[in-house]
Amino acid sequence: MAQKKKTKSAKAKPAKKAPAKKATKAKDIKYVYDFGKKTDGDAKQRELLGGKGANLAEMARIGLPVPPGFTISTEVCTYFYDNKKSYPKSLDAQIRQSVELMEKQLDKKLGDLEKPLLLSVRSGARDSMPGMMDTILNLGLNDQTVEALAKSSGNERFAWDCYRRFIQMYGDVVMGVQKLPSEDHDPFEEVIETFKAEIFPNAKGEVDDSKISASQMKELVHRFKSLVKKRSGKDFPICPWEQLEGSVGAVFGSWMNDRAIVYRRKYGIPAEWGTAVNVQAMVFGNTGKKSGSGVAFTRDPASGEKVLYGEFLTDAQGEDVVAGVRPPRPVAQLK
């Protein structure tokens, strides 16, 4: 009989496994987007950066002189409300890294006793919601850094004016020092008007805040801090990082304040969108009569005519324009 050839059975090769997808860890998620000399975002990212953050990034990207800063994304706002008003673990480190980048660009430092960096903290929803959420200016000031600002600017009154504005904004927005149902006026404004009546007893009509001297501003700061302590039971915070944390939380919190909710319902803006938070280096309009703040458009908003249109106030900060503290002047007068 013919012998059968022995055949070796080929062993089946194991199928190659598809490379496992790396799970995105919370620490890998980018929550903070810089703008300035280093810019992460652009105009297409309104959902993530909000309208203001996306536009700031786009302007910086095309080379316009945008003061440096960073945007905390709308994803953090969503996390904030989904997790009992807490933050992702990696957020603090990302914010500190972005602040350090600003410090290097400007040669200033948050809390520094020679060249302090001061910040603004603003909201930035996908669709504009003017005046509905909160803003804080001049963040970073305390009893020491205000002296440094006075020295570095050569303008003591300006420095103390910034400080009293910061205490008023932070006290209201973060610490809840607001008008009570039994009161007719904002408590900070009551303090200002009482103080002006003391120092200008013979004044006829309303006295403009610009008439208050540097030494008088110092006294006003003292009275503001006393008001904060009395109403909130807490001292005004002196640590700039504590101030920044409180301000960011307050801006996210303002997404759900009563006026923002009413506005969203009226204009069909979903609550799920959330708001971004924009942190930016301060530019000052209250250094004297040769500085100012205002609003400008490249076209007339009413007619669409291609003309520079807007209004401004001299020796003022942005909130003065919004609040209508005195009649603004048309931008056309600058020609």
PLM regions: where:
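Nucleotide/phosphate-binding sheet-loop regions of phosphoryl- and nucleotidyl-transfer enzymes
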Residues: A2-K335
